């Protein structure tokens, strides 16, 4: 049972972690790396239903992420309504069409060639769920008073990492989608002025036939410096 104490007028509880010897830790972290390294961005989803409880637990995991001053500056909007998904697809494809046919510089489009992406986003309707993460630039307390958030962008980024790991752990697949601009999402989902769309994540089972680019991740030496 956790111990409790008061520090400068604020409640604290004791914190302990299960201890593993170094050999067990090596096995655990190697297993987790191997498992996470199997994760791939997917654009081909099955429309097979996913139990709501699975999505709820995935979101709870994401919301366990650390955040600036523990303000938890996020809202996870879950869309399963076919009508709303269709609306989102129509508006997203308008923006993506403009991006692919005018906004994007040639170098960007060249970098996307190995991924073979285009402005058509059928996965926004096929995936059983869209999880749309909104970032709160400020918030309100229970009395309705405006309150600050801190490092909201970084906090939401960390939460999205937790979210993607939880999706993969559940046996589902996902895609990180960022139509730009994303203001239409606030309108469709009737979000308050303090929330701004941060990321669109279609979630579901992988389609029976799914192809992903044969690309490689950078090596440890390429992504780390040791001092």
Predicted segments, located by residue:
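Glycine-rich, charged/polar anion/phosphate-binding loops
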Residues: 61-63, 114-119, 185-187, 210
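C-terminal helix-cap and adjacent tail motif
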Residues: 2-24, 28, 196-227
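N-terminal accessory segments that position/regulate proteins before the catalytic core
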Residues: 1-42, 46-57, 87-90, 98, ...
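Small-aliphatic-rich amphipathic alpha-helix that forms the alpha element of a beta-alpha
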Residues: 58-63, 137-188
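Short loop-to-beta-strand entry elements in the cores of soluble alpha/beta enzymes
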Residues: 69-80
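Glycine/small-residue-rich phosphate/adenosyl-binding loop
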Residues: 5, 78-156
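Short, electropositive alpha-helical surface patch
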Residues: 185-198
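Glycine-rich phosphate/pyrophosphate-binding beta-alpha loops
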Residues: 63-69
């Amino acid at each position: 049972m956790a111990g409790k104490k008061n520090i400068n007028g604020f409640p604290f509880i004791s914190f302990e972690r299960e201890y593993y010897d170094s050999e067990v830790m090596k096995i655990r972290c190697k297993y987790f790396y191997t498992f996470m390294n199997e994760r791939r961005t997917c654009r081909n989803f099955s429309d097979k239903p996913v139990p709501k409880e699975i999505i709820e637990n995935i979101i709870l995991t994401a919301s366990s992420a650390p955040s600036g001053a523990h303000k938890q500056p996020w809202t996870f909007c879950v869309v399963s309504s076919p009508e709303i998904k269709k609306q989102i697809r129509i508006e997203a494809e308008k923006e993506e069409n403009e991006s692919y046919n005018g906004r994007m510089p040639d170098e960007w489009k060249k970098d996307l060639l190995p991924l073979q992406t285009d402005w058509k986003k059928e996965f926004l309707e096929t995936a059983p769920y869209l999880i749309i993460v909104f970032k709160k630039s400020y918030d309100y307390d229970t009395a309705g008073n405006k309150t600050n958030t801190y490092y909201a962008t970084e906090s939401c980024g960390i939460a999205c990492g937790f979210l993607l790991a939880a999706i993969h752990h559940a046996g589902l697949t996902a895609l990180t989608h960022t139509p730009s601009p994303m203001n239409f999402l606030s309108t469709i989902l009737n979000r308050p002025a303090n929330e701004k769309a941060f990321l669109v994540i279609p979630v579901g089972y992988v389609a029976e036939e799914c192809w992903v680019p044969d690309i490689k991740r950078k090596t440890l030496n390429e992504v780390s410096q040791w001092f």
